[in-house]
Amino acid sequence: VRAEDIIQTADNQEFTLVYGGKRYTAKLPVVGEHHVMNALAAFAAGIEAGMTAEEIIPAFLRYEASGMRQRIEKRGDITVILDCYNASPTSMESSLSVLGGMECSGRKCAVLGDMLELGEMSAQLHAGVAEYITKNADCAFLYGAEMANCREALERSGFEVHHSTDKAALTAELLSWLRPGDIALFKGSRGMRMEEIAEKVK
C-alpha cells in the first residue's frame, strides 16, 4: 500500500491510495504528510482485519487532529495552525513543511518558541531550524532565549525575523503584522505556552 499525488489545501489533503493493483481517491480533513502515513497504516490494519478498501477509505474523513497537535482554526480572515504540544528539531521541520505546503492568499508566518531540554546541542539545533523557516515561511516571530540562535541565523540570510523574550511584546508585534489571508503556525515546547500568543489572534 502506498500514497501518490498528495495535494494539500488550507485545511485538508487528497491523495491517491494504491493497493492491490487498484487506485483509490482518498481525503483527510487534516494537513501534514505524516497524517497520510498514519492513514496508510490504518488502511493496512483494516485490510488485515478483513475490511475492504471501500469500507476503510470513507472513514478517513472522520479523522481529527487532537488537542494542540497541528489543529487548524480560522480566526476571522487568518488561518491559525496550533501545534503547541511539544517541539523537537524533527517536529519543527515537519510542522514547517505543513505550513509550506498549504495554499495561502496572503503570507505565511512561523511563530516559534524555544525547544527545551536539548542540552549542549541546543544552540546549534535552534540555529538549524532557520533553514526550514526560510524554505516554508515569509516571516518568523521567535519567542525565548534559545531562539536567539535561530534569529541570528535568519538575520545572516536577510530573512524578516522578530525575536523577543517578552511574550506580550512579541504578541503585539505579531498582531500588528498579520493581515487577512495570512497563515500563522504556532509551535514550541509545552513549557513555552505558545497557545497564549495564538489566543490573541482573533
Regions found by a protein language model. Name each.
Residues T16-V18:
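A generic structural motif
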Residues A10-D11, G20-K27, V31-H34, L40-K202:
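ATP-dependent carboxylate-amine ligase
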